[in-house]
């Protein structure tokens, strides 16, 4: 982080209390917001990196995981009003007119000043899921009385009919 960046929030859709997990193809997507302690607007740009399950760079080229250009401007901003500390509040939604995601998985979002592309001021992680195998969960009363006070009994069914599952122990 740059020490002038504050109040970073990353969340699904419009709910700031939600986890940063979006559904592939959902126009609500991910929202990223932050405050920049400054008197005037600074021009920020962003780029995305597709990561593997351990958040390491995947090595995929941009066209394999997104449609559009893997660079855009953070254009949504508002100046602070009636505060003792001056700041500019920035907001970005993904997907947007510049970037459409093609793959589910882990993404790293990097934000940097337009004039200094090598000087990243913040980066944040978000995930995109794909609903290929619906999961049905039901809670039922516990059958073992010894565990009743501290445990729950769940029945979980995964519908893999439409999904390609070769190794259920690792793929689910």
Feature locations, PLM:
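Beta-sandwich strand segments
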Residues: 116-123
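Low-complexity, Pro/Ser/Thr- and charge-rich linker/hinge segments at domain boundaries
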Residues: 128-151
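Extended, solvent-exposed segments with strong compositional bias
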Residues: 66-87
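Extended low-complexity, serine/threonine- and proline-enriched intrinsically disordered segments
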Residues: 40-68, 166-172
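Ligand-binding face of N-terminal immunoglobulin V-set domains in extracellular IgSF glycoproteins
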Residues: 84-115
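Contiguous beta-strand segments within globular domains
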Residues: 2-50, 146-162, 167
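Short structured motifs
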Residues: 15-19, 31, 73-78, 91-95, ...
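Residues that flank catalytic or metal-binding motifs in active/ligand-binding sites
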Residues: 44, 88, 103, 122, ...
């Amino acid at each position: 982080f740059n020490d002038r960046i504050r109040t970073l929030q990353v969340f699904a859709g419009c709910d700031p209390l939600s986890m940063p997990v979006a559904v592939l193809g959902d126009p609500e997507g991910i929202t990223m917001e932050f405050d920049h302690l400054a008197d005037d607007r600074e021009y920020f740009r962003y780029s995305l990196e597709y990561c593997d399950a351990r958040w390491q760079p995947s090595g995929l080229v941009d066209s394999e995981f997104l449609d559009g250009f893997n660079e855009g401007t953070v254009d949504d901003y508002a100046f602070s009003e009636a505060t003792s500390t001056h700041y500019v509040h920035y907001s970005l939604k993904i997907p947007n007119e510049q970037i459409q995601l093609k793959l589910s998985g882990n993404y790293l979002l990097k934000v940097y000043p337009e004039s200094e592309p090598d000087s990243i001021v913040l980066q944040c992680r978000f995930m995109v899921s794909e609903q290929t195998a619906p999961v049905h969960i039901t809670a039922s009363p516990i059958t073992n009385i010894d565990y009743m006070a501290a445990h729950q009994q769940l029945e979980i069914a995964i519908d893999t009919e439409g999904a390609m599952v070769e190794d259920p122990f690792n793929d689910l």
